[in-house]
Amino acid sequence: MNYNSINLVKTHLINYPCPLNINFLWNYGFLLGIIFFIQILTGVFLASRYSPEISYAYYSIQHILRELWSGWCFRYMHATGASLVFFLTYLHILRGLNYSYLYLPLSWISGLIIFALFIVTAFIGYVLPWGQMSYWGATVITNLLSGIPSLVIWLCGGYTVSDPTIKRFFVLHFILPFVALCIVFIHIFFLHLHGSTNPLGYDTALKIPFYPNLLSLDVKGFNNILILFLIQSIFGVIPLSHPDNAIVVNTYVTPLQIVPEWYFLPFYAMLKTIPSKNAGLVIVIASLQLLFLLAEQRNLTTIIQFKMVFSAREYSVPIIWFMCSFYALLWIGCPLPQDIFILYGRLFIILFFSSGLFSLVQNKKTHYDYSSQANI
């Protein structure tokens, strides 16, 4: 057993063969793993002093911040880590879209399942501080599920956000990261089943071991992200936080604008630019499903050969518009829903889905041997 464990570490962490020409864009997975581990540690420490009851939830957060030794540090590190996880996740997906990672369907789908778990975990975690923005944000999102009354009752423990809601959200927020951690190991297994891609898109026999060559590249990226993480945790959390969330919940007063965290803004833009809440919810779910469909591009291209090339590095035009429309929706989700933003939001939603569906029928030139996952 001891020998098998050592052999597993040597195979997947030390002697794992990597392409010689990969660059810093391949650091995001390693950085995500480190930040996610920090999130779990800080979350466990915070959970030990948090009270999931509506009369004490807000005050338990204030107790952690003001009275517990270094409690403010753990609280701000946890808040900053959530933003950093999504920032690195978006970059990780962006790199996958650009460098043919979607041709590995099992790796791609397992990664998107982790992304979906991150979304659910972050949302229910945003409710736990029980400030004004947390309460009303939870009310708005749970009202979207009113088309399925039994689901609302099961999730909230009633027809409105109340004490059973925060208890259930706390339990889910504690459990889901460990579920995501299990899928992370599955994701790594599927990745190592074939091997890492590279910027050129050529499967080459010229490879080097992960240690010490590429580990030094990952450590360099970790040093940079650690500096950013600590500076933001210590100095930058308060100016970027919502002031309304520092106020005790008042169920009779609605904030001027209910705005989620920045990493939810693209999906929030889809919700607020569509007049029907059920249609908005369907569009949000469809936007995530579209990413899953990209894994089937490998199969669809055997039927339809439609290639659109942009620049010498062969980025496809649909994928570029797909990414640009996503970041445009991120910007549109922040301001008040005025007519001009609603118009642009709908236009970018159309562009988002049309470019994503267009990319399904393009044929990107690749020289990889995907036989390990070709018949899955």
UniProtKB/Swiss-Prot annotation:
Keyword presence, Repeat: no
Gene3D superfamilies: Cytochrome Bc1 Complex, Chain C
Keyword S-adenosyl-L-methionine: no
Binding site for a ubiquinone: H192
Membrane topology listed for this record: Multi-pass membrane protein
Keyword terms: Electron transport, Heme, Iron, Membrane, Metal-binding, Mitochondrion, Mitochondrion inner membrane, Respiratory chain, Transmembrane, Transmembrane helix, Transport, Ubiquinone
Highest taxon in the source lineage: Eukaryota
Residues involved in heme b b566 binding: H92, H187
PANTHER family assigned: CYTOCHROME B
Descriptive protein name: Cytochrome b
